[in-house]
Amino acid sequence: MYQDKILVRQLGLQPYEPISQAMHEFTDTRDESTLDEIWLVEHYPVFTQGQAGKAEHILMPGDIPVIQSDRGGQVTYHGPGQQVMYVLLNLKRRKLGVRELVTLLEQTVVNTLAELGIEAHPRADAPGVYVGEKKICSLGLRIRRGCSFHGLALNVNMDLSPFLRINPCGYAGMEMAKISQWKPEATTNNIAPRLLENILALLNNPDFEYITA
């Protein structure tokens, strides 16, 4: 019988492509008895272009590589100091719709930021989480065979300047924010556990096993 347990992998700082490939392989080979997983990772600097991404939103990538991704959404930037959380969930088994998962991920971030005294909100017209008009978290998902992969990217204490080389998520002039603007002591090391605790709470607190790479 299936046990509701989630494997949480802390992968540290990794290049984007091998992690993306591993995520695809996991999703393609999982079956009904495969446990869901959550991967916590930071990436070396990279622009990722979403499945429907338009080239004109990549303004001047310079020395940062641009990699095509099959997630939803337009172009975004990943770099050290940004906490990425990939959610590899069997949505059918969890009786979660795609829209419900997006809402759950946005609420995870809103709740995490509220604990830090930062008031944040989602926007109906542009997925993600915002503080005022500034975007602090990007979302992009893909569903295959009833299972989700990709996830969210929360700006913690990263260098935001590479976002100026793109129209983030397809919005010209979209300003970005990071947690350390309000909480200078914030690091991915102290934000990741809060993020994890909040998503597990919204998934009804399943058992979990924490695995470090």
From Swiss-Prot:
Role noted for this protein: Catalyzes the transfer of endogenously produced octanoic acid from octanoyl-acyl-carrier-protein onto the lipoyl domains of lipoate-dependent enzymes. Lipoyl-ACP can also act as a substrate although octanoyl-ACP is likely to be the physiological substrate.
PROSITE patterns recorded: BPL_LPL_CATALYTIC (PS51733), LIPB (PS01313)
Catalytic activities: octanoyl-[ACP] + L-lysyl-[protein] = N(6)-octanoyl-L-lysyl-[protein] + holo-[ACP] + H(+)
Catalytic site positions: C169
Keywords annotated in UniProt: Acyltransferase, Cytoplasm, Transferase
Record-marked site positions (Lowers pKa of active site Cys): K135
Gene: lipB
CC terms in the record's Gene Ontology section: cytoplasm
InterPro entries in UniProt: aa-tRNA-synth_II/BPL/LPL, BPL_LPL_catalytic, Octanoyltransferase, Octanoyltransferase_CS
Family per record: Belongs to the LipB family.
Pathway note: Protein modification; protein lipoylation via endogenous pathway; protein N(6)-(lipoyl)lysine from octanoyl-[acyl-carrier-protein]: step 1/2
EC numbers, comma separated: 2.3.1.181
Natural source organism: Escherichia coli O17:K52:H18 (strain UMN026 / ExPEC)
Subcellular location(s) per record: Cytoplasm
Protein name per its UniProtKB record: Octanoyltransferase
Listed HAMAP family: LipB
Predominant cellular place of this UniProt entry's protein: cytoplasm
NCBIfam families: lipB, PRK14342.1
GO molecular function terms noted in the UniProt entry: lipoyl(octanoyl) transferase activity
PANTHER family with a match to the protein in the record: LIPOYLTRANSFERASE 2, MITOCHONDRIAL-RELATED (PTHR10993:SF7), OCTANOYLTRANSFERASE (PTHR10993)
Binding positions for substrate per the UniProt entry: R71, G72, G73, Q74, V75, T76, Y77, H78, S138, L139, G140, G151, L152, A153
